[in-house]
Amino acid sequence: MLVFVPEPAVATRRLTPVLEAGVVAVGTLAAVAVHLQLWRAAWREPWVRGGDADFYLMVARSLGRHGSYLHNPSLGWPFGQHLADLPEGADNLHLLLLRLFAVLGRGPGAAVNLFFLATFATVAFTSHLVLRRLGCSRMASGVGAFIYAFAPYHFIRGEEHLLLSGYEMVPIGFLLALSLFDEPLPLLRERGRRGLQWRSGRTALVALAAICLASTGPYYFVFSMMLILLAGTLQSLGDRSWRPAASMGLIVGLGVLMFAVNVSPSLLMDLRHGTNTAVGQRSPFETQLYGLKISQLFIPRQAHRLDGLATAAQRSQGPIAAYQSEPGQQLGLLGAIALSVMLVAFALHAAGARRRAWLDERAATLVRRATVMAVACMLVGAIGGLSFLVSSAGLRQIRAWNRISVVIAFSTVVGLAVGFDRVTLSISRRLAGRPTRLRLAALGLATGLIVVAFADQGGSDTPPYTAIHAQYNSDAAFFAAVRQRLGAGAAVFNLPYQPFPEVSPRVGTGAYDEALGFIYQPTLNWSFGFMRGREPDYPRALESQAAPEWMTSIAAIGFTGIVLDRHGYSELDRARQEADISALAGPPTTSADGRYAFFDLRAYAETTKARLGPAGTAARAAQALALSTDTPGG
């Protein structure tokens, strides 16, 4: 077989690449520790706050406290939070790992930090194994794995896009696609034999790979299936044979089946209650907003170590936010050079140019196939590319096609690893009979590439640990005081009202900032976080009422406290709101940084319930919870 190196006959040799990959993973973690200056970090404090980072802190806390991300009775009280409308199940393996860290780390901050660091190890591990399987040397595979794990994409996604940081299955998907170019084909017997080859170690590994691909993120699953479809189709047409297409169909079918199993809670929710039209609705036009900008592959990464390159990267984004797509598409210096060389070499080969062969046929074929994969990714993912047609055909949940840059990055790593081996081969011929010098030369080349990758691909990513510590202590102390005042099980009403999920910031409050109460104090119940479009958005309806009216309603529902985020109001509105609440509930307690105000409603609630009586209280609560300014989507 052209793509795969032969399997060693000795069992211990089969473990050698695994042990090598483990060493590379540990070395990558050590480099990340230096880059992020982890000796300064406090593990329980999340290193990124705001935006989607708070969403994943919320998910980590839900996993640790309730064992599932799907239902959280502590949020969206009294309805509870139901996340089936967000198909996170496609990341079930990642969520399982996050739950493990939530239990071991005893807190969401530690869980998210540990998960993020673990992704560097898992990406390096799988990359090394795949490169070795493709026939690259031990040293070339180790260098390539480090470069790939240290990609700018990894740091820029970071904890804000936590699950996207786990792109360890991208190399596996790449390998499955390449395996379709040669015999023996996955899940099929060798030529001359009949039937399906179900009972073999290779079949089990292919099936496991397809299952894992369907469980580690919808984007990486779709990208991998796209490559598999491309490879199978090209090989079937080239060989005029049904076999590559059949193998392709079996892999894709198994992956799609497992993907459906993973997202079955979301599918069942839609079947039973109808589609929630208020959440997760995408349009083909969004592929133009979040598509791949091919020029971004070749420029320096954002927040580069060198000020001049950082400025150049910033200018390349342009002044119009609508056309900036997402950050993190850059390949880095080594990847940009590799992709340029690969594209030129492929063009010369396609044009039939005669030149002295620099690579042997096996290596040249591998690089050409990797280049085809990269070109296909660019054609599909680019703004104005085929992704618009894919979305128009129905695959609308995959809108940020710029993320396919991480697949392109691995194709360049394949080219780099093959090039590394070719250079060391040339050196070995010149240093024949001098093994010590040869080893030193190869080690020097590897070290140089690693140093360049470390300096170029890792930018100004060190978290501001001092500021993080101050903010964490202020927030933790404030919410702990709320818990101490009200006691476990009490219900707290969040102000201002922030719909959930995927909404624009309100003044200075992010989409998930109000989840912090649950993140810090999960024994309390919080009004924030019920799924819009499924439950009546009574807090929004209450906003239009005078303070005596809406405060009577929330007291009847069972809330005994209010936490007001001052960043969610203009100065005038904040002063008016606090004055109205204080007139009925007394003055607030504020956080050390002045952002949060807490109003104790226990005395007010007791007086209100006594005035209304049991029947009146129940009627008022039912009336308030039925209020809505939107029509639920099911």
What annotation goes with each model-predicted range?
Residues 263-347, 517, 604-606:
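Periplasmic/ER-lumenal interhelical loops and adjacent helix-loop junctions
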Residues 229, 249-257, 419-457:
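Signature aromatic-anchored transmembrane alpha helix within multi-pass, membrane-resident enzymes
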Residues 17-51, 58, 252-270, 379, ...:
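Transmembrane signal-anchor helices characteristic of membrane glycosylation enzymes that use polyprenol
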Residues 1-39, 236, 247-254, 347-373, ...:
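Start-transfer (signal-anchor) and selected internal transmembrane alpha helices
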Residues 27-31, 114-134, 138-237, 255, ...:
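Membrane-embedded helix bundles of polyisoprenyl
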